[in-house]
Curated annotation (Swiss-Prot):
Biased composition (Polar residues): 166-180, 305-316
Pfam families for the chain: Brme1 (PF15710)
Subunit text: Interacts with HSF2BP (via N-terminus) and BRCA2; the interaction with HSF2BP is direct and allows the formation of a ternary complex. The complex BRME1:HSF2BP:BRCA2 interacts with SPATA22, MEIOB and RAD51.
Gene expressing this chain: BRME1
Name of this chain's protein: Break repair meiotic recombinase recruitment factor 1
Protein species of origin: Homo sapiens (Human)
Amino acid sequence: MTKRKKLRTSGEGLCPPKPLKNPRLGDFYGDPQSSMLGCLHHPEEPEGKLGPVPSTQQHGEEPGKAVSSSPDEETGSPCRLLRQPEKEPAPLPPSQNSFGRFVPQFAKSRKTVTRKEEMKDEDRGSGAFSLETIAESSAQSPGCQLLVETLGVPLQEATELGDPTQADSARPEQSSQSPVQAVPGSGDSQPDDPPDRGTGLSASQRASQDHLSEQGADDSKPETDRVPGDGGQKEHLPSIDSEGEKPDRGAPQEGGAQRTAGAGLPGGPQEEGDGVPCTPASAPTSGPAPGLGPASWCLEPGSVAQGSPDPQQTPSRMGREGEGTHSSLGCSSLGMVVIADLSTDPTELEERALEVAGPDGQASAISPASPRRKAADGGHRRALPGCTSLTGETTGESGEAGQDGKPPGDVLVGPTASLALAPGSGESMMGAGDSGHASPDTGPCVNQKQEPGPAQEEAELGGQNLERDLEGFRVSPQASVVLEHREIADDPLQEPGAQQGIPDTTSELAGQRDHLPHSADQGTWADSLAVELDFLLDSQIQDALDASDFEAPPEQLFPSGNKPGPCWPGPSSHANGDPVAVAKAQPRTFVGIQASEASRMEDATNVVRGLIVELSNLNRLIMGTHRDLEAFKRLNYRKTKLGGKAPLPYPSKGPGNIPRGDPPWREL
């Protein structure tokens, strides 16, 4: 009895108390208070409650239609991301222990109030697009850092424009909405993220996008919704009627937010601004990478970002494009394949050339008549080696900001030399600074001075068949000769004026080849000479041992005059040079080779002679010793045989007693 009473008193009994069902209903299906405060509580205590809940609200709710009054349910705020690891199915709610005992969870009011204030501050300041986040993300990529420094003030102004619509879109009336079937609020043109997706857009992102979508409501391009749950990822999809399109320069343009879904998600059409048409790629687009963050930037090969030529739209375009592009964390996750060069020096831009190496190992310069071979004064972009399959789709308008005073006709295609390369097409674009500073073309090969960069080294190492003179490679003479031979063989349209910087060493090399003897003739002469010398040493080795002043015959080492001897064949029939030059070149080479061979032969002769003398001395010593030993044994045997003529009855065991038969020295 005492043990059972102790269990009842301590609450460790097997039977749970009666008020257990109401908290469990609230924990699993979520009453208004728990759904509103669950996101604001500590992540480890999402099911805690501030006070008792009326039983009418808990029993009257159905499992699939619980009322959700939390703005985080609709907007997918970062607090919802914190609750994502807690959504794993558990057999018991956290309000019960392993024995089934009810453990009341008390919320912490101070943390709740603090988190509410933090959420309000984030909503007011649009924390998702704050400059701090951009600076933090741009610290990892130099290209984004330059753009952030240029677009700092307009970006902050553009983010503040989204505050008026934020309160209406972030806190709509949701008394009759369920967490599974979420209806978009007033002023919201996009479907909300379902509650089971933890990577939805935050309230500040949705508010800013709603404000931008209202500005681009009268857009002539087809507008569609964004696929929910893409985690804020953006990607340009090829449109049907946007191939070869250029923005209308006469009509005022309002660039909407570039808001498209990942290519791998179903129902992901496109919503884009007037001044940002997309060029369709020749290959299917790839979906967003699964390992990237919620705000990563998806790049698509083959899409060209073309800015609006109207200079009046520059500040607003800078804000919107910077907000949609450079606030994402894709600059650090994907490495931002294309780096924007913001230098505005015309002389520097005139000296630089742009080169993109295709993944198939081929690249060619676009003809001057191509409309895409135009560049603004804002700079150009350089493709990094090894990353050409992912072409950067940055639409920074920093270059256009410096052209407010210029007429729209100066900007032909875009603010910066936007490049795109479809995989397998083998076509690259070249921007040479401002349209007024376009380099003159002398055919497919253009001689421009540029220091060899990493992209050029990549092209050279990969053995790509491109115009080397376009980049003005300055390499060693041998490499330049090889490149020149390739250009002559592969490019018949080459003009002589385009290669003034490269020295003409082809004719010199051909002359040197003509002066040199043929390789086959050299091999034959060397083999015959070696055979003759070997035969001489083998046949006259005995004479060399006898004669101390042995020397090779002078006729063999040095033939008389310049006439080719038996070891040296006549001039090669393949030589097309001057016979006099060939005759002059042959004796020099012959004499040099013979001198080296003679010195080596002399040294070898002395060594061989010394070795033979040593071997002969050793042989004499060995034979003399053997003879002395044999004579000593014979003498000893004779003495023993003469001394023992009389037969002894018992032979002595001394050393003189040798049994008859073969002597022991013959057995040696």
